[in-house]
C-alpha cells in the first residue's frame, strides 16, 4: 500500500517535470562558469595557504548555488551592506565560511573591475581579496602583509564582523533557527513587502533535532519570505550516505531533504543536478514566483568537493597536503586558461616550514597566488562586466521595490526610551505590601508594559508553557492566537514547534539580530538555560563582533519555575544548577542574569538590564504565590536598591557582626520571614546582602562596587543560596565561609519531591535551619575569650 503526505498548503515541484526554459544564454552561462572556476580555485588556495585548514568540500559544492543567489535572485545593494530593506543571504552552514569569504572577495573584485561605484565608500564595509590574508587568523597577527593591507581577521565560522553577515553560525542547526528568526523579524516589520532571506545549508546540517523544530515553526507560521537552499551532497564528516536515497537506507536519517521540508509544509523544488547553472537559476526563479504563502526549500543534488580532486566526506574538513601535486592539479584548469604560474618550492622541502620566518614566507606565497588570480580576473573583463551589471541590476530592483515598514510596525526604540526615562516603577506595576502575586506574573506584566509602549516589539514563545510561566500576558492586547504571516500577523505569540526550547532560543536570537524586536522565550529554567545556551552564546558572539562595545540586540530567556519551590515536580524540574550555566559565563556586558526575590524588584531590575542593552537577559523567576513584604516596616532596603546587582538588604542596627550573602527567592523569603526574626530575638546583628544580578554589579564602576560590597565583607561572609555552591564563590571568599554556606546540594544528593517548604527543609534551607547555621557561623567568627592569667603560689 502506497503512502502519501496529507493535504499541504505547499507544493512539491520536480524541476525536470516543469519544462522550464533555460534562464541563461550561452554567453551568460559562460560567465557564470568562469566565475565558478575562479571560485573553486580560490577555495583550493585558501585551504593550502592557511595552511591546511577550513572546509573545502562543502564550500565548493555550494558555490554555484550561492553564485545564483548573489548574481540573479537577490535584491540588494553591494555598496550599502546595512540596508535593512535588502534581501539577506544567511549561511546557516557556518562551516562553509571558506566559500563565503571566497565569494565575497570575488564579488568585490567583479565590482572593482567592472564598476567601482558599486562598492562601499568605506573599506570596512568591503571584503577585499587582500582580506583573505586574514582567513582563520587571529586579530593580533603581525605578519607583514596582514599588517600592511589591514586585512580583516576572518573567523573560522562567519560572524557579523564580515559585511552582509547578520549572524554567527557554525554550531550545527543553530544557524537554521536563527536564519528563520531573521526572516521572522523582516516579515513582521515589513509585512507583505518583505525582504527575502536566503538560507544556505547542507543535508548534514539538517540532522540536528533543533532543525526539525525550526522548520515546523516556519511552516506553521507561513513564513513565506524564507528560501532555503540545500546543498545535498550526501557527505558529512563521517558518512558518505547521510540520507536515505532511492532504495538505499541512509546512515544517519531515513528521510530525504525533500521529505523533511515538505513534512513541515514547505514548498519543495527538487533540482537533479546542482552543478548545472541552468537548473540552479531556473529553480531559484520558480521559487521567486510561488504564491502559496509558505516557505520554500530548493534541494540541489551536488557532489562534495567536485573537481577539487578529493570528493565526499574526505573533503569536508580536509584537503590536499601543502603545495602537493593534488593541490596544483586542482588549479591546473585555471593556470592553463589564464597562463598562471603559482609559487612553488624546489626540492623536497617547503621554505615556509623552515626557519623562523616560515609564516612570512607562507604569506608571501599566498599573496602572490592571490595577485595572479586577480590578474586572471582582470584579463577576463567580459565576466567581470557581465556579473557587475547583475550587481547593478540587483540594486536597481531593490530601489524600485521601495520597501517600507508596514503600518503599525513595532517601534523597538520605544522600549529603550521607556526604561531610560521612567522615574521609578510605573504606577500600573506598583505593588502594595500584602499583595499576593508571583515573580513570573510580575515579569509578564512588566514585559507587557514594554510591549504596549512599543506597539508590539516583543514577540514571545514558550515550550508549551505560555500560561504556566505567565508570558502569555506579554502578548495580551494584541491579536489573539499564534502569529501567522498571512492569517494572523497582529498576534505577538509565536508557535515554535511545541516543546522546543532549542529552536525557540535560536529563532529568537535571529529575530533580535534583525534589529526590530526583542524575542522572549520561556520554559522551566532547568531546561531553557542548558538548551538555550548555545544559541544565546552564538548570539552574543555575533552581537559583539558587529558592535564590540555595544549596544547589542537583546533577546530574553525567561528561566521560569526556578529553584526549589518547584519541588512538587521533583529534581528533574526543580533544578538549582541552571544559574551556573549562565551567570558570569559571558563576556562582560553581553549577558545579564536577574535573580529577584521580591516581586517588587522585577521592574527595577528589568529596566536596569534593558538600559544596558545586552545580547541576553535571563531572569530567574519562581512559580508559587508570594506575599509582597513591607520592606520599610521590616527594615529592609527598598526594591530599587536591587539595580546595583548586590545590595545591603538589611543594615545592622548596631556595629554589625558577621556577613550573610543571600541569592534566590525561596531562601530569601525563608530568611526574611523566619530566620531574621529569630536572629533579632537573640540580639544577633549581621550585615545581610542580597545578590540580584552579578552582571549588573560587574557593570558598576570599580569604586562603586567597593562601596556597595566592600571586600572585607566577602572575606568574612557565609552564603545562603537556592542555586549551586560555585555561584557563591564570588561573594564568599574564605574557606570557613564557603564551608558554612548553605546550598541545595550540601547534603550530597539530589533533593526529593514535595511542596516548596518541605524541599527547603530537606536541603537545610528553611528559616529555622538558616538561623542555626548563621548563629553557629557567627560564634565561630568570634575570637575565643581571653583566659585570665593566674599567678602560682610560689610567686606570690
Can you annotate each of these PLM segments?
Residues 51-63, 89-95, 148, 157-178, ...:
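Active-site nucleophile and cofactor-binding loops and adjacent substrate-binding regions
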Residues 27, 31, 39-44, 49, ...:
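Cofactor-binding active-site loop characterized by glycine-rich and histidine/acidic residues
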Residues 48-53, 67-77, 84-87, 163-165, ...:
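Short alpha-helical segments and helix-capping/turn motifs at coil-helix boundaries
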Residues 1-45:
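Cofactor-/ligand-binding subdomain signature composed of acidic, glycine-rich
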Residues 23-29, 44-54, 82-87, 160-169, ...:
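Glycine- and acidic
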Residues 34, 377-551, 625, 635-669, ...:
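Non-catalytic terminal/interface segments that mediate subunit docking, oligomerization
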Residues 328-404:
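Non-catalytic, alpha-helical, charged scaffold/linker segments
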Residues 134-165, 174, 178, 188-194, ...:
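Thiamine diphosphate
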Amino acid at each position: 500500500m502506497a503512502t502519501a503526505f496529507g493535504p499541504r498548503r505547499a507544493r512539491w515541484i520536480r524541476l525536470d517535470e516543469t519544462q522550464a526554459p533555460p534562464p541563461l544564454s550561452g554567453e551568460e552561462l559562460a560567465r557564470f562558469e568562469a566565475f565558478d572556476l575562479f571560485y573553486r580555485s580560490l577555495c583550493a588556495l585558501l585551504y593550502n595557504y592557511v595552511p591546511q585548514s577550513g572546509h573545502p568540500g562543502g564550500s565548493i559544492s555550494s558555490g554555484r548555488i550561492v553564485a545564483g543567489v548573489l548574481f540573479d535572485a537577490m535584491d540588494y545593494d553591494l555598496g550599502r551592506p546595512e540596508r535593512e530593506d535588502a534581501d539577506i543571504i544567511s549561511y546557516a552552514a557556518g562551516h562553509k565560511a571558506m566559500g563565503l569569504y571566497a565569494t565575497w572577495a570575488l564579488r568585490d573584485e567583479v565590482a572593482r573591475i567592472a564598476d567601482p561605484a558599486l562598492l562601499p565608500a568605506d573599506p570596512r564595509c568591503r571584503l577585499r581579496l587582500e582580506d583573505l590574508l586574514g582567513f582563520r587568523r587571529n586579530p593580533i597577527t603581525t605578519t607583514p602583509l596582514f599588517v600592511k593591507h589591514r586585512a580583516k581577521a576572518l573567523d573560522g565560522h562567519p560572524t557579523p564582523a564580515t559585511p552582509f553577515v547578520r549572524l554567527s553560525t557554525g554550531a550545527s542547526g543553530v544557524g537554521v533557527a536563527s536564519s528563520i528568526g531573521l526572516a521572522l523579524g523582516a516579515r513582521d516589520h515589513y509585512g507583505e513587502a518583505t525582504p527575502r532571506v536566503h538560507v544556505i545549508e547542507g543535508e548534514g546540517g539538517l540532522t540536528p533535532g533543533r532543525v526539525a523544530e525550526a522548520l515546523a515553526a516556519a511552516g506553521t507560521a507561513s513564513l513565506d519570505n524564507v528560501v532555503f537552499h540545500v546543498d545535498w551532497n550526501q557527505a558529512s564528516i563521517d558518512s558518505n550516505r547521510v540520507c536515505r536515497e532511492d532504495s538505499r537506507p541512509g546512515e544517519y536519517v531515513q528521510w530525504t531533504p525533500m521529505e523533511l521540508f515538505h513534512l513541515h509544509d514547505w514548498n519543495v523544488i527538487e533540482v537533479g543536478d546542482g552543478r548545472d547553472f541552468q537548473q540552479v537559476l531556473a529553480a531559484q526563479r520558480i521559487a521567486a514566483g510561488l504564491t502559496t504563502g509558505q516557505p520554500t526549500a530548493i534541494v540541489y543534488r551536488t557532489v562534495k568537493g567536485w573537481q577539487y580532486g578529493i570528493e565526499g566526506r574526505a573533503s569536508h574538513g580536509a584537503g590536499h597536503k601543502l603545495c602537493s601535486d593534488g593541490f596544483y592539479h586542482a588549479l591546473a584548469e585555471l593556470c592553463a586558461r589564464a597562463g598562471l604560474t603559482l609559487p612553488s618550492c624546489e626540492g623536497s622541502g617547503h621554505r615556509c616550514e623552515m626557519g623562523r620566518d616560515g609564516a612570512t614566507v607562507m604569506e608571501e606565497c599566498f599573496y602572490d597566488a592571490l595577485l595572479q588570480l586577480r590578474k586572471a580576473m582582470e584579463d577576463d573583463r567580459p565576466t567581470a562586466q557581465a556579473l557587475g551589471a547583475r550587481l547593478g541590476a540587483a540594486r536597481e530592483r531593490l530601489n524600485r521595490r521601495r520597501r517600507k515598514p508596514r503600518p503599525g510596525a513595532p517601534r523597538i526604540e520605544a522600549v529603550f526610551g521607556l526604561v531610560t526615562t521612567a522615574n521609578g516603577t510605573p504606577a500600573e506595576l506598583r505593588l502594595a505590601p500584602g499583595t499576593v502575586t508571583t515573580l513570573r506574573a510580575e515579569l509578564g506584566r512588566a514585559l507587557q508594559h514594554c510591549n504596549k509602549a512599543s506597539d508590539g516589539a516583543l514577540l514571545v514563545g514558550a515550550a508549551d508553557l505560555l500560561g504556566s510561566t505567565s508570558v502569555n500576558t506579554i502578548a495580551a492586547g494584541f491579536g489573539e492566537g499564534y502569529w501567522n504571516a498571512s492569517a494572523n500577523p497582529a498576534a505577538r505569540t509565536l508557535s515554535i514547534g511545541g516543546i522546543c526550547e532549542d529552536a525557540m532560543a535560536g529563532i529568537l536570537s535571529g529575530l533580535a539580530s534583525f534589529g526590530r524586536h526583542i524575542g522572549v522565550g520561556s520554559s522551566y529554567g532547568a531546561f531553557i538555560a542548558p538548551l538555550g545556551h548555545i544559541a544565546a552564546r552564538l548570539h552574543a558572539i555575533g552581537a559583539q563582533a558587529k558592535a564590540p562595545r555595544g549596544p547589542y540586540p537583546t533577546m530574553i530567556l525567561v528561566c521560569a519555575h526556578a529553584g526549589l519551590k518547584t519541588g512538587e515536580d521533583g529534581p528533574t524540574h526543580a533544578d538549582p544548577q541552571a544559574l551556573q550555566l549562565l551567570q558570569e559565563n559571558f563576556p562582560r556586558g553581553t549577558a545579564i542574569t536577574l535573580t529577584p526575590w521580591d516581586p517588587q524588584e522585577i521592574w527595577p531590575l528589568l529596566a536596569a538590564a534593558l538600559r544596558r542593552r545586552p545580547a541576553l537577559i535571563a531572569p530567574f523567576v519562581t512559580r508559587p504565590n508570594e506575599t509582597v513584604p513591607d520592606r520599610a516596616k521590616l527594615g529592609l532596603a527598598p526594591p530599587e536598591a536591587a539595580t546595583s546587582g548586590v545590595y545591603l538588604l538589611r543594615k545592622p542596627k548596631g556595629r554589625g557582626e558577621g556577613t550573610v550573602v543571600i541569592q534566590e527567592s525561596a531562601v530569601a523569603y525563608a530568611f526574611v520571614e523566619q530566620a531574621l526574626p529569630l536572629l533579632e530575638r537573640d540580639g544577633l546583628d549581621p550585615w545581610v546582602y542580597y545578590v540580584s544580578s552579578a552582571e549588573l554589579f560587574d557593570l558598576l564602576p570599580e569604586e562603586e562596587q567597593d562601596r556597595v560590597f566592600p571586600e572585607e565583607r566577602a572575606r568574612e561572609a557565609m552564603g545562603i543560596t537556592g542555586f549551586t555552591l560555585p555561584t557563591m564563590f564570588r561573594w564568599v571568599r574564605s574557606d570557613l565561609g564557603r564551608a558554612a554556606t548553605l546550598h541545595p546540594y550540601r547534603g550530597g544528593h539530589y533533593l526529593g519531591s514535595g511542596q516548596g517548604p518541605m524541599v527547603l527543609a530537606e536541603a537545610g534551607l528553611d528559616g529555622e535551619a538558616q538561623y542555626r547555621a548563621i548563629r553557629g557561623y557567627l560564634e565561630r567568627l568570634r575570637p575565643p575569650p581571653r583566659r585570665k592569667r593566674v599567678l602560682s603560689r610560689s610567686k606570690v
